[in-house]
Amino acid sequence: MIEKVLEMDDWKAYKIPHTVEIDGMVEETKTLIIEFKNKRKVLSTREGFKEVKYVGNHSIPVPFWDKVHNYKDYENQVLNKIGIKKEDIALLSTGANMDNLAVAKEEFDEFYVVAFTTAGAKHNAIRLGDEEADYIEKDFKTYKIVDGKIVPKEEIGTVNIILITNANLTDGAMARAIITITEAKTNAFQELNIRSTKHPELQATGTGTDNIVVVKGFGSGVDYTGGHTKMGEMIAKAVKRSVIEALIKQDKIKI
């Protein structure tokens, strides 16, 4: 049965429960879908700019974390299960349980922003700029570096943030929003004192596999989404609250 999450004037969010299969093993899972009345322009850190009818976040079941060796085939299976074409959706994937989804909304004047976040930091929290990488990409394929050797490995996203606004953001404002979102996510990690997985003496700034989708609206135009603007403040507050809530839920953090 479809689970309602949130409904606005021209879009609605819901979770679709379904199954996925790998090598004869079948697992139950859920995919978050945000459906728009009219196509919207989005900026995804996975796919770049795209005009879509849907945005989604799929939860890869725990038993499949080390089994998704061909992500494109797996993604196609998910899309077939939920009945949406690839060109119509900006889809993210996560190892987090979709029941631990966090939603936060901020409003001011005619504007609103809503953040949908799944997050987990137990397995690959990292402090960027201070740690060595575990992976290398060659010809669009990802490989893990083990003892100086390259071996095939597919990694699963850990902190996924979908940010929706009714503001008509310029392309630059959408791109700048990614910086604001990232800073707010790091703020949340610091507030919860999330440590690097490999180097616990270091404060983590995020995980190595985080992704973001920014969705613009059809309201008044906005050209800047940095921290000195009300739009930037709203984005940051919604993201921070949702990241904190999602981490507490997924990682069972006690505060």
Swiss-Prot record:
InterPro entries: AdoCbi_amidolase, CbiZ. It comes from the Archaea. This is Uncharacterized protein MJ1613. It comes from Methanocaldococcus jannaschii (strain ATCC 43067 / DSM 2661 / JAL-1 / JCM 10045 / NBRC 100440). The lineage of its organism: Archaea, Methanobacteriati, Methanobacteriota, Methanomada group, Methanococci.
